[in-house]
């Protein structure tokens, strides 16, 4: 199955504690159906000091399930479903189903 969400996409959280938050996809984990989104699902972990790092509390983004995110429509920024179509060059591209706008540039 083709990937509907890719690294670099702007997505909106549609469920969870960060619902309504927009962010950029930093990493896609297809085996677990999860994505890492910038500034979303922040967690803190204790880091032991090392020779290069002083340690302490570190914050980073934890993965969220793909069902909790939706691609932002390129036209108005609202959550939208994704469809696929073949363009004039024979490439499979993604488009926003509500506006018909192409997601792939």
Swiss-Prot record:
Its Gene Ontology molecular function terms? Answer: rRNA binding; structural constituent of ribosome
Q: Which residues form the signal peptide?
A: none
UniProt cross-references to InterPro entries, sorted A to Z: KOW, Rib_uL2_dom2, Ribosomal_uL24, Ribosomal_uL24_KOW, Translation_prot_SH3-like_sf
Annotated Gene Ontology cellular component terms? ribonucleoprotein complex; ribosome
* GO BP, sorted A to Z: translation
UniProt xrefs under SMART domains? KOW
What keywords sit in the KW lines? Answer: Ribonucleoprotein, Ribosomal protein, RNA-binding, rRNA-binding
Q: Which NCBIfam families match?
A: rplX_bact
Give the multimer and partner information: Part of the 50S ribosomal subunit.
Family to which this protein belongs: Belongs to the universal ribosomal protein uL24 family.
PANTHER family, sorted? MITOCHONDRIAL RIBOSOMAL PROTEIN L24
Role summary: One of two assembly initiator proteins, it binds directly to the 5'-end of the 23S rRNA, where it nucleates assembly of the 50S subunit. One of the proteins that surrounds the polypeptide exit tunnel on the outside of the subunit.
Q: What is this protein called?
A: Large ribosomal subunit protein uL24
- Annotated organism of origin: Hyphomonas neptunium (strain ATCC 15444)
Gene that specifies this protein: rplX
